[in-house]
UniProtKB/Swiss-Prot annotation:
Pfam families: MFS_1. The keyword Zinc-finger does not apply. Coiled coil: none annotated. PANTHER family: MULTIDRUG RESISTANCE PROTEIN MDTG. One of its GO terms (molecular function) is transmembrane transporter activity. Its main location: membrane. The keyword Transmembrane helix applies. Keywords: Cell membrane, Membrane, Transmembrane, Transmembrane helix, Transport. It is found in: Cell membrane. Belongs to the major facilitator superfamily. Gene3D superfamilies: MFS general substrate transporter like domains. This is Uncharacterized MFS-type transporter YitZ. The chain crosses the membrane at residues 25-45, 63-83, 120-140, 141-161.
Length: 164
């Protein structure tokens, strides 16, 4: 999941800025992202008592896979706002699901070390994906990078189903 999101992240920022006509719209769209994520966390907390955290990760993966197919076709600021709200919701599912999963699969004595290793590798793969995305953008269209990320998200969802 981290690889797929990092692959498109720099291009999405440029894409959002180019749709709007002001930095106010740009700031508002990112505010919607943060606010929508914040507002769903209490619900996710209650739902995590009833549902396995992998379901949150699965919803994030497949929701992002579908959403990224739509992103290259965004043509208005209102559409950017809607996408930002959905990105915030899916991002919250991913963050919440991964933290619960990490807590469930680590022992308290080794937890700090394992979480450190987890964050190291996710940061390394995120950085590699950002660099690869820049390289690929020189040879393909930015839209193709969004579609490739969509495929990666979908595949990560399939992998979660197989490991569940």
């Amino acid at each position: 999941m981290f690889f797929a999101s990092s692959l498109i992240f720099p291009f999405y920022i440029l894409f959002v800025k180019n749709i709007g006509s002001s930095y106010t719209q740009f700031g508002f769209s990112y505010g919607l992202f943060g606010l929508s994520g914040a507002l769903i966390y209490p619900l996710l907390g209650r739902l995590s008592e009833r549902f396995d955290s992998r379901y949150f990760l699965l919803l994030n993966s497949w929701g992002m896979a579908v959403l990224l197919l739509y992103v290259p076709h965004i043509g208005s600021v209102v559409q950017v706002y809607i996408v930002q709200v959905l990105l915030g919701l899916f991002g919250a599912m991913q963050k919440h699901g991964e933290k619960v999963l990490i807590a469930n699969f680590t022992d308290s004595g080794e937890r700090g070390k394992k979480i450190g290793n987890y964050h190291f590798w996710t940061a390394v793969f995120s950085a590699a994906a950002i660099m690869l995305g820049g390289f690929l953008a020189d040879f393909f269209t930015v839209q193709m990078i969004f579609y490739a990320s969509s495929i990666l998200y979908f595949l990560s969802g399939l992998m979660m189903m197989k490991t569940g």
